[in-house]
Amino acid sequence: MDGTMGLQGLLCLCLASHLALQAMPTQGSPTDSTKGNKAVNGVVIRSLKVNCKVTSRFAHYVVTSQVVNNTNKPKEVAFDVEIPKTAFISDFAITADENTFVGDIKDKVTAWKQYRKAAISGENSGLVRASGRTMEQFTIHVTIGPRSKATFQLTYEEVLRRKLTQYDIVIKVKPKQLVQHFEIDVDIFEPQGISKLDAQASFLSKEAAAQLIKKSFSGKKGHVLFRPTVGQQQSCSTCSTTLLNGDFKVTYDVNREKLCDLLVANNYFAHFFAPQNLTKLNKNVVFVIDISSSMEGQKVKQTKEALLKILSDLKPGDYFDLVLFGSAVQSWRGSLVQASTANLDAARSYVRQFSLAGSTNLNGGLLRGIEILNKAQGSLPEFSNRASILIMLTDGEPTEGVTDRSQILKNVRDAIRGRFPLYNLGFGHDVEWNFLEVRALENNGRAQRIYEDHDSAQQLQGFYDQVANPLLKDVELQYPADAVLALTQHRHKQYYEGSEITVAGRIADNKLSSFKADVQASGDQGFKTTCLVDEEEMKKLLQERGHMLENYVERLWAYLTIQELLAKRMKLEWAEKASVSAKALQMSLDYQFVTPLTSMTIRGMADKDGLEPVIDKPLEDSQPLEMLGPRRKFVLSASQPSPTHPSSSIQKLPDRVTGVDTDPHFIIRVPQKEDTLCFNINEEPGVVLSLVQDPDTGFSVNGQLIGNEARCPGKHEGTYFGRLGIANPATGFQLEVTPQNITLNPGSGGPVFSWRDQASLRQDEVVVTINRKRNLGVVREDGGTFEVVLHRLWKGSAIHQDFLGFYVLDSHRMSARTHGLLAQFFHPFDYKVSDIHPGSDPTKTDATMVVKNRQLTVTRGLQKDYSKDPRHGLKVTCWFIHNNGDGLIDGVHTDYIVPDIF
């Protein structure tokens, strides 16, 4: 395809669970139109569809858009989608010119190696950037050919969280041109039954919304459909501009007559806990406020505004105090006082009058607030029965008193001792976010950023509203230890009105009959209940929702588990952090989620530097969108990616490698000699040869020979590797590779992949990456990088069977005792070649080689190395050792025959 960039025609789609859709034209005037669509530089958005399926809070979104280039020149098109920060991308594909380019998810370290060139140059090859308060912006620019079309499809998933008595799905709609087929379709299935459902659009009058938005719910099902015609999209009857510009919002809640909402499918369960009609607990609350000089201006003004409103919301049964910290620490009363009218009036006066002072004694402010709550709980029994809450607001980092982050974390942990939650609010982008979040997570709370904007006071108030009405404290959801194999967080310090606690887990085989949930908590009165599984009801639900229910319950568990592991790793260091990170990475790969530990690449696309695009998940501390450099532009190949390109998931290959391929030729790289040696092994089909054996770790690679399907009896014919076994008994890792399938842990019924798959797998310290129809990489974290090459043969080939090649890319960290037909050559050895002369074959040269105190006749010849080019191979000049490597290998070749590949 011609890579020339024309004038830009941009499709912009912004999505959230919170979703937003947006299409933005660029410079230049419209030049064409199709069936009522107004073209932007000849590029038309033919269709734009958002499909959202919610099953028991698990939301699965698919955004699909088709654009058409009606010009005779290539055009640049951008697909732009905003997704919530809490969501994980799980799939992306582009179809253009009858070719489909799909995303591959792999671990971030592997992906980073591929894109280190872009990172070093300072350019940004990432497609996802932080955008706004709750969103991440996904954007990809591609060039499509003349008179052609491109279809983009993005999939992402999340678990909807209940806030203030409802679940929200918000779609920001801004296509910037009329769209022939525009559709938002939301399908909701909730086993508890839907209690309310509404949908509104900020860009439509109430009358127009009632006419255009179709919404209905009955029993377990709810549906919202917005499908305006081109005429209904017009801003006026004679206009060519669109009125679709604003928020499309769906809200719903579920029935809660039953205390128990326990869902089980395919040995996974989800437990939703949100009891109603409970008496609100009185609370002890201390507000710890940063009054350092950096809070000057709008920050302190809006903080005071929010505090005044929050004080007005306190109930007479609540107790409270205020702590201010700058260079010094001051408290309003120094102990909790009742939220009486007189005390509230005095507190409001104090808030209006306080002024800013100096630096940031964060440690001192927090410890003073904790001391006030601890003192109250220890002094009077009635205080201990209340729900205690500590809320801290700061805009910066500690600069006064104790400033060491580790020491502050320890001081706060030791002072709170798990008695109550700490909520940290960070004002603006200068706040040290990771430190803020870890401090909250270590103390049963959470962190939230308050953005510097006209509505900062409303943001503060909005956060407080979520924790203003505690109903229960010390909530524990318990499950039989022998029936549950994996479990998400099931202990919570407090449960607040309008929220929901969600626990998910995996049930052991044959343990469903003994599975139950015991819930206990402290409230106005003691709270205790037991939930059992209604198996008949589960069967009915499976009949209604089928595979979708089974799949979504498991993915809900995976989503929650990954989120919790990512949060947990922030609190850990060194080996513990590495262990938790490895678990989160493995689950991200298993369930194909783009998380902070994984990346998605799109094969078959490249920018001007030949780099494929990469989809990452930005961290909360990522720079705002406008602070980042220009995005890279990618061109779709006319066909699928060429096999001549090195694998993206395998490190850069040395100029020459050690390996074995074809019938079977062993190629031994001798770097200290800057030379290569070769030999063949002639054995019968079915024989298994030991290629690598490390007795110190148990790691091994064995290969089984196959022959020509049409062999002639009595005639020697070539053999090839048709089956490889890679194993590490110490960790239970086994990988069986054939030209048809790749099987992880075949002895225990592990997953099976075909060579048509693209996947990255991790087990313990081994990472396996499958590159579709080409090769497979195996990386041991403690040493050793290997590649398996797939040889697919054409129908007219004389061999008649597909086979495998095996290459060693890095062996320098393997133990000194590693051995095998290949591995014995990982260690340095010496030889001398002399008496080079014409051989019996006039086209080849013979010589005398002295190696291992033996004198051999060797022949100069050519072999092929397929590690870089699996299809054609690269010619390698080598000294060929005859008679099965006799004299070069230790012992004789039959010493390396083993019973099986494992």
Curated annotation (Swiss-Prot):
It comes from the Eukaryota. GO terms for cellular component: extracellular region. The modification Aspartate 1-(chondroitin 4-sulfate)-ester is found at D663. Residues 282-442 form the VWFA domain. Residues 1-28 form the signal peptide. Glycans are attached at C52, N69, N277, S639, T644, N741. The modification Phosphoserine is found at S121. Residues 664-902 form a propeptide. I-alpha-I plasma protease inhibitors are assembled from one or two heavy chains (HC) and one light chain, bikunin. Inter-alpha-inhibitor (I-alpha-I) is composed of ITIH1/HC1, ITIH2/HC2 and bikunin. Interacts with TNFAIP6 (via Link and CUB domains). Belongs to the ITIH family. This is Inter-alpha-trypsin inhibitor heavy chain H1. It comes from Sus scrofa. The gene is ITIH1.
